[in-house]
Regions:
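Non-catalytic substrate-recognition/targeting regions of SAM-dependent transferases
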Residues: 36-37, 42-44, 65-130, 138
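Conserved SAM-binding loop of SAM-dependent methyltransferases across substrates and taxa
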Residues: 156-168
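Conserved SAM-binding motif I beta-strand of class I
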Residues: 170-175
Length: 310
């Protein structure tokens, strides 16, 4: 991260500050490798917080230079009054977040597609909502009317919130992280949703197929796993186990949204494995990613693929 890269960052963020979005958005996506020297840095506008995240230790001198560049932004006429500036060190075991302006809030409320979500800033590696899945949540909201939805690896239930907002008849959320599911309940309550049609299962998926199947069949199944979760999920080893179960979980005209966010795994992985493990399902389309997530290699970015029962 040399002086030229930092100047590029300063220019890009200055432009972003001149036209900040009303909702939360990524405003700089270095991980798409479109800007040399900034491949390990992102910046998100979270409606009153500019969160800059570093995914690799740049070294002491470049880090201090980065701090100085960011702090100059807060003195510019474009800087919003009372906005906070946070720098998250994602490469550290505790993903430490330092406040360069203002304080690190314990909780923070944002909106996306007209829906509200609660974030954790400064306490965890991930803050509670993956912004690159914005179009995926919008698609679910558009498809959900009257549907029975299964949301696997639900995390904080962003897909569930979108589905209920779109008129889903019922949503079953499954994730082994009960604290994340609890935040999912909070997100539903933030949006005034009746939780009578929402189920939260804090179980390990591969030990819970019976319970999942009994709550079906489902009109829409969403699969959005981590690339690797120590002790419970490895994408290359375990995704196939889910795909082969889909025919018994889906309703007659069932639809699947299958996702992968590993830069080393292209969309062909899901298409080929689905054809092998669940040939009853045909590939329909790959959802577009938001434009604020440019990638020099599009197949390295988020893959959200739609499959439909033949």
């Amino acid at each position: 991260m040399n002086a030229e890269a930092l100047e590029t960052l300063h220019q890009r963020l200055t432009l972003a500050l001149q036209a900040l979005p009303e909702e939360s958005r990524r405003v700089f996506h270095g991980r798409g490798r479109c800007w040399e020297g900034l491949e390990h840095l992102t910046a998100d506008w979270l409606q009153g917080v500019l969160l800059v995240s570093l995914f690799r230790d740049p070294g002491a001198a470049p880090l201090q230079a980065l701090r100085e560049v960011l702090e100059t932004l807060t003195r510019s006429p474009q800087w919003p009054v009372d906005a906070r500036l946070l720098l998250q060190h994602r490469y550290l075991p505790d993903s430490h977040t330092e406040a360069l302006r203002g304080e690190v809030p314990e909780e923070w409320l944002i909106s996306e597609n007209g829906l509200r979500y609660k974030l954790d800033l400064g306490r965890k590696q991930n803050n509670g909502l993956f912004l690159d899945m914005r179009y995926g949540r919008r698609w679910v909201q558009e498809q959900a009317q009257g549907k029975r939805v299964l949301n696997l690896f639900a995390y904080t239930c962003g897909f569930s919130v979108a589905a209920i907002a779109g008129g889903a008849a019922r949503v079953v959320n499954l994730d082994m992280a009960r604290a994340a599911l609890s935040r999912g309940r909070d997100n539903h309550r933030l949006n005034g949703h009746d939780l009578g049609g929402v189920e939260f299962l804090g179980h390990e998926l591969f030990k819970s197929w019976g319970k999942v199947k009994r709550s079906g069949p489902y009109d829409l199944v969403i699969i959005d796993p981590p690339s690797f979760q120590k002790g419970s999920f490895a994408l290359s080893r375990d995704y196939q186990k889910i795909l082969r179960r889909l025919p018994e979980l889906l309703a007659e005209a069932g639809v699947v949204l299958a996702c992968v966010n590993d830069p080393d795994v292209g969309p062909g992985f899901l298409i080929e494995e689905m054809a092998r493990e669940a040939p009853e399902l045909a590939f329909s389309e790959r959802l577009e990613n938001p434009p604020e997530f440019p990638d020099i290699h599009p197949d390295s970015s988020l893959k959200a693929l739609v499959f439909k029962r033949r």
